[in-house]
């Protein structure tokens, strides 16, 4: 896919630091012109195969098992010592060097040494996860280059969506670093304005989670909480969602879980109610920063958290990505959209690149057959 990117997205923006640029620089010693053309044509055929109904194709279909899909994790997956095993790959080391040059501080040192409190701060955690995920791609490129060459789609959870856009050459790497800095700072400021929380929530078919959230929100209002909110922030898998809102609202749900037939609630280690209206103040600075970036059409399908559908073009990214800050992450819907196919049609290989194994575990609960061909490239 490196070759395809060069041909399909040429010329690149002058001065932009795209994933294909720095990744191909790390591997260009073995690249030949004939291979570029062959890989580009093959990749374009893969994309065409996926975009046309099978009965309308006039050429032999490419086996879906020969294609790949990338998934990228979000904030909360970071841990002290992350990326240590990636440093044996020159490309991964170069990614961190470039990040340090742009950020003007040693992000890798924070990943490796912490302390945990520093790494978990939103302004560091989001950058650490994104850069480590891109570094994990370098391990994949070294060990299974075909997975990169035949990749036809990508998606990322929350912050991971920005990682996916970098991977798809829609967003330059250096600009993405600055954008994530703005995003993290603005989201932390929103957290400071209203104390919020998030909780993984397991429930049964007899649970009315919407009513429970509405009751919690009304309870906050009655108690004098200003402009309270409680609602679904992440759609994970059947009978599992992340609920977020004011701290008081989640405390109400936890105390009354049995009466609402909620089976379990587990608080997430985050500083606010992400992907809810409580983050509204973060939208404007993020949108302003995004407008300064010259976006490109993704060279592969990248799915939006907002509606679970692929981005259509660069302008679509500009309008859709800011909404993600205050809208629920529709991850379950995204997985259905990505892996929906006719009976008997094989699934692509799926690679989760970044810290943790959570996205593959969720895929197992949403589509067990698709998960049989999934792999982790752990940062």
Curated annotation (Swiss-Prot):
The active site is at residues 158, 275. Residues 1-23 form a transit peptide. The keyword Acyltransferase does not apply. Keywords: Fatty acid biosynthesis, Fatty acid metabolism, Lipid biosynthesis, Lipid metabolism, Mitochondrion, Transferase, Transit peptide. GO terms for molecular function: [acyl-carrier-protein] S-malonyltransferase activity. It is found in: Mitochondrion. It catalyses: holo-[ACP] + malonyl-CoA = malonyl-[ACP] + CoA. The keyword Lipid biosynthesis applies. Its EC number is 2.3.1.39. Disruption phenotype: Eggs have a thin shell. Gene3D superfamilies: Malonyl-CoA ACP transacylase, ACP-binding, Malonyl-Coenzyme A Acyl Carrier Protein, domain 2. It is an enzyme of class 2 (transferase). Its main location: mitochondrion. Belongs to the type II malonyltransferase family. This is Probable malonyl-CoA-acyl carrier protein transacylase, mitochondrial.
